[in-house]
Regions:
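Conserved beta-strand -> loop -> alpha-helix junction used to position metal-binding or nucleic-acid-contacting
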Residues: 37-44, 49-86
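Conserved structured core elements
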Residues: 14-21, 40, 44, 81, ...
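RNase H-like nuclease fold core
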Residues: 1-39, 44, 48, 53-56, ...
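A detector of single, family-specific signature residues
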Residues: 10-20, 24, 28-29, 77-81, ...
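A generic short alpha-helical patch detector that favors 3-5-residue windows
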Residues: 12-16, 38, 62, 75-79, ...
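Amphipathic alpha-helical interaction elements
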Residues: 12, 51, 55, 75, ...
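Mobile genetic element proteins and their domesticated derivatives, centered on retroelements
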Residues: 4, 38-41, 50, 65, ...
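Acidic/histidine-rich catalytic cores and adjacent linkers
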Residues: 89-199
Length: 199
């Protein structure tokens, strides 16, 4: 129906693979099917858990995180805006062949002036192009993990008020209540994903 839905919640001390694997396995055990797409950052623990539990699902590396990650490979501060614009130029292509062509063009552009950046782009940017396998009218919503980041920010903001928690169960209760409220808002709110078109 195009509505967002929270499928589960978990409390863990880290983003280690074992925690993600446990969470994703619990979703599978509850009967959640194989997703058509998983969008996330490139955290190694999460990537390993996805391979172990949802290997059949295509993975889209969050384009926003890719933009941020590129900063580490830019040799001069004065190049930051240009590089950001070039990455956006790739992401805003009409289709995958055009995105690949633009990527090759940009990699070539930086091969001499910023070889580490060019190598990083060549290896990392394709992970953010999986979205081109999906209809154009839903790509914008699925190309980043911003929805999850916003959700996590809301949880942090509302749990910070409570301060310290005596045990894991108490924080899980509060987080679950917060997520139930948000889920109800989503269910009664606007459609998040438009009906899929064939083009």
């Amino acid at each position: 129906n195009g509505k967002r839905m929270i499928l589960g919640t978990s409390v863990a001390l880290s983003e280690a693979e074992v925690h993600w694997r446990t969470f994703l396995s619990s979703l599978r055990e509850r009967g959640i099917g194989i997703p058509d797409l998983v969008t996330s950052d490139a955290h190694e623990g999460l990537k390993s858990a996805l391979k172990a539990t949802l290997n059949a699902s295509p993975w889209q590396r969050c384009q926003f995180h890719l933009q941020q990650n590129a900063q580490a490979y830019i040799p001069k501060v004065s190049m930051r805006q240009e590089v950001a614009d070039d990455i956006r130029y790739i992401f805003n292509a009409r289709n995958r062949p055009e995105a690949d062509m633009r990527l090759n063009e940009i990699v070539e552009k930086y091969s001499k002036s910023a070889p580490d950046l060019a190598r990083w782009m060549e290896n990392a940017i394709p992970e953010g192009l999986t979205i081109f396998a999906f209809p154009e009218n839903i790509r914008r919503r699925l190309r980043t993990s911003n929805m999850c980041e916003t959700l996590n920010s809301q949880i942090k903001r509302r749990t910070r008020v409570a301060g310290l928690f005596p045990n894991e169960a108490s924080i899980l209760r509060l987080v679950s209540a917060i997520l139930m409220d948000i889920s109800e808002e989503w269910e009664s709110g606007k459609t998040y994903l438009p009906q899929i078109s064939s083009n």
